[in-house]
Amino acid sequence: MNTRPFYFGLIFIAIIAILANYLGNTDFSHHYHISALIIAILLGMAIGNTIYPQFSTQVEKGVLFAKGALLRTGIVLYGFRLTFGDIADVGLNAVVTDAIMLISTFFFTALLGIRYLKMDKQLVYLTGAGCSICGAAAVMAAEPVTKAESHKVSVAIAVVVIFGTLAIFTYPLFYTWSQHLINAHQFGIYVGSSVHEVAQVYAIGENIDPIVANTAVISKMIRVMMLAPFLLMLSWLLTRSNGVSENTSHKITIPWFAVLFIGVAIFNSFDLLPKELVKLFVEIDSFLLISSMAALGLTTQASAIKKAGLKPFVLGILTYLWLVVGGFLVNYGISKLI
């Protein structure tokens, strides 16, 4: 068995990931809140649509491994970023709000995209995952469950990145208007429950107030912890929608990496490992996710994205409006009830 395409592919991916990580830590990237994940997929797409086809057979096995196994490992290790103690810091209000926003946003996106915009179901589910939970990371986590092609994943990531970035500029303006309705703590929950990416949530909070920032990040991480049950629900929905009756012996596909993700988060909650080791796991996790994004970019053809048309972005802006307006109404209502 020729293993050279496997190892050469991993080395090639590692080089792109290292470059993306370096660029993601520059002052320019920090100022404009451009993460290494986004840089990795852009670099991957740039190479994938120019010189990569000339030597793809020499590295393809390693690239596909990075896109699959490294992604799943990265999602599992993501659990080291979370503890269940975080929930106590923001209270039941945030948990209920996050759950309502996750469910309502996903089904809003699915209904709008499939029934009214007549879009590809896989693309809609990926976009819904990204808008409902944690942006690009959720899209990547949903990819093995939906079994979507690379270009669909890239389109979904583009949608959540564009409108999540827009949120960085609009939410601080909205805070000024809403101060007479909700306090800083409640606005932090609103940000954490409705903005796409963790980095975007942090950026918004830092631009407003320390209380908003701390509450928003914790609220967002609670939303991230809902990734595993969401993937199980998505797997069940896909099985049912594919025409599997309750009387058949067909088994629902369980995304075990999602279950392990929760297991790691539970383990991390007991604070058994030295903080330096946990920090190392988080750094390894970041590199694995950056690597898988680079592999995703390499296997994405620009022509396939162009073929998707404007509908994904129409879906993105309508979902964004739901997150901003509907999200505020949900947060305001919950704050009065709990």
UniProtKB/Swiss-Prot annotation:
Enumerate the Pfam families for this protein: Cons_hypoth698
Q: Which UniProt keywords apply?
A: Cell membrane, Membrane, Transmembrane, Transmembrane helix
Kindly list the residue ranges recorded as spanning the membrane.
5-23, 33-55, 62-84, 94-116, 123-145, 155-177, 222-239, 254-273, 280-302, 312-334
The keyword Signal is annotated on this UniProt entry: no
Cellular location(s) = Cell membrane
Question: Topology with regard to the membrane?
Answer: Multi-pass membrane protein
- One GO cellular component term noted in the UniProt record for this chain: plasma membrane
Top-level division of the source organism's lineage = Bacteria
User: Chief location of this protein?
Assistant: membrane
Q: Which family does it belong to?
A: Belongs to the UPF0324 family.
Protein name (Swiss-Prot/TrEMBL): UPF0324 membrane protein NMB1979
Q: Which organism is it from?
A: Neisseria meningitidis serogroup B (strain ATCC BAA-335 / MC58)
